[in-house]
């Protein structure tokens, strides 16, 4: 049995944040608030969502992009994180898996995901 105060707090956190509907295979553009000393700035991170896990306030997702020199960069974000300013879905991917960890082994065109037809 969960504490009713914790449940009320989690529901308030979820209702405050406007999160778009996305799943694994979608290309996302994230605006992340970064604090360096006294200054804060927004850094964009664009990549493919390769996994979503958890539920409620503790739900997280993994975004993978190919950085400089072809090096893959993966970051894990809590969906309801205060540091996430904005989540924008750029493309909907047509995939048949909920976890796309096999993309870690793919390079170039083999790592492409087909776009979902409307």
UniProtKB/Swiss-Prot annotation:
GO cellular component, as recorded: cytosolic large ribosomal subunit
Protein task: This protein is located at the 30S-50S ribosomal subunit interface and may play a role in the structure and function of the aminoacyl-tRNA binding site.
Keywords per UniProt: Ribonucleoprotein, Ribosomal protein
Cited InterPro entries: Ribosomal_bL19, Ribosomal_bL19_sf, Translation_prot_SH3-like_sf
Biological process, per Gene Ontology: translation
GO MF annotation list: structural constituent of ribosome
UniProt protein name: Large ribosomal subunit protein bL19
Keyword Ribosomal protein applies: yes
Family recorded in the similarity comment: Belongs to the bacterial ribosomal protein bL19 family.
One Pfam entry name: Ribosomal_L19
Taxonomic superkingdom: Bacteria
């Amino acid at each position: 049995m969960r504490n009713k105060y914790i449940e009320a707090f989690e529901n308030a956190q979820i209702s405050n944040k406007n999160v778009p509907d996305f799943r694994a295979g979608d290309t996302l553009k994230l605006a992340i608030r970064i604090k360096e000393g006294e200054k804060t700035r927004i850094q964009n991170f664009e990549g493919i969502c390769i996994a979503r896990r958890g539920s409620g306030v503790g739900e997280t997702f993994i975004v993978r992009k190919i950085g400089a020199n072809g090096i893959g960069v993966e970051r894990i974000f809590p969906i309801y994180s205060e540091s996430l300013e904005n989540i924008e879905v750029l493309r909907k991917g047509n995939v048949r898996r909920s976890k796309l960890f096999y993309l870690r082994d793919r390079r170039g065109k083999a790592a492409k995901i087909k776009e979902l037809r409307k």
